[in-house]
């Protein structure tokens, strides 16, 4: 569970699973989006857990361009490759087999290095390096914005070091039924996802900061 606080709030807002936050005032909305962009150096936006521990910038996933968001970006792949390496560490027999095969490959290459006229040197290849060389990445098959959102959420759920996903103005591209389906999936995985919207998102449960800067809950069960 993540809490958010910024100057116009009287008290922190709890982001429990899927949370929709609508901000009617354009200047306040754009300012908050900017604070999220600059979270690593920003002092106005506070994100923290129920133990009052501040969220690190590396724990935040911010999506402002759904179709342009690269789930295979270098930072994400680094986390995935690291997780795969840990999986091998938990399976000693499989890890041993891979290391033996890697050693065989190294020996063959070493022999060719010795045969070469140049004075060549080499290093032993690690499992992590093998994963990178094999080009391990996420298979992307999304054809619609809804499918891309679902794909991003799945990646976020897999990445244990990410603790808050924020979609900016995604409601403009999604039907009510699609938003409901995304929220249902998010609530099942029990991780914090914030939909930050400049206008009310249908008649769904949401928090609204109106033009008088009052925070109200609408359509809450």
Curated annotation (Swiss-Prot):
Ca(2+) 1 binds at residues 116, 118. CRISPR (clustered regularly interspaced short palindromic repeat), is an adaptive immune system that provides protection against mobile genetic elements (viruses, transposable elements and conjugative plasmids). CRISPR clusters contain sequences complementary to antecedent mobile elements and target invading nucleic acids. CRISPR clusters are transcribed and processed into CRISPR RNA (crRNA). Binds dsDNA, binding is disrupted by EGTA. One of its GO terms (biological process) is defense response to virus. Its cofactor is Ca(2+). Homodimer, in solution forms homotetramers. Changing residue 132 to A: Abolishes dsDNA binding. This is CRISPR-associated protein Csn2. Gene3D superfamilies: 3.40.50.11940. Belongs to the CRISPR-associated Csn2 protein family. The keyword Hydrolase does not apply. InterPro entries: CRISPR-assoc_prot_Csn2-typ (IPR010146), Csn2_sf (IPR038600). CDD domains: Csn2 (cd09758). Ca(2+) 3 binds at residues 139, 143, 151. Pfam families: Cas_Csn2. Coiled coil: none annotated. GO terms for molecular function: DNA binding; metal ion binding. Ca(2+) 2 binds at residue 124. The lineage of its organism: Bacteria, Bacillati, Bacillota, Bacilli, Lactobacillales. Keywords: Antiviral defense, Calcium, DNA-binding, Metal-binding.
């Amino acid at each position: 569970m993540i809490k958010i606080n910024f100057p116009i709030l009287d008290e922190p807002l709890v982001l429990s699973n899927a949370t929709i936050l609508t901000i009617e005032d354009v200047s306040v909305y754009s300012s908050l989006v900017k604070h999220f962009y600059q979270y690593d150096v920003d002092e106005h936006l506070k994100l923290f857990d129920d133990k009052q521990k501040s969220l690190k910038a590396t724990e935040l996933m911010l999506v402002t361009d759904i179709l342009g968001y690269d789930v295979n970006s270098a930072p994400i792949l680094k986390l995935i490759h690291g997780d795969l390496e840990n999986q091998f560490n938990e399976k000693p027999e499989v890890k041993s087999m891979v290391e033996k095969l890697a050693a065989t490959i190294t020996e063959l290459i070493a022999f060719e290095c010795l045969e070469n006229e140049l004075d060549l040197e080499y290093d032993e290849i690690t499992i992590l390096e093998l994963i990178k060389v094999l080009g391990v990445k996420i298979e992307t098959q999304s054809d619609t914005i809804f499918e891309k959102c679902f794909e991003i959420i799945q990646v976020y759920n897999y990445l244990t070091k990410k603790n808050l996903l924020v979609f900016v103005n995604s409601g403009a591209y999604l039907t009510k039924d699609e938003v409901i389906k995304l929220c249902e999936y998010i609530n099942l995985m029990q991780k914090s996802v914030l939909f930050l919207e400049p206008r009310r998102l249908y008649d769904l449960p949401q928090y609204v900061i109106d033009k008088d800067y009052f925070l109200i809950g609408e359509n809450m069960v």
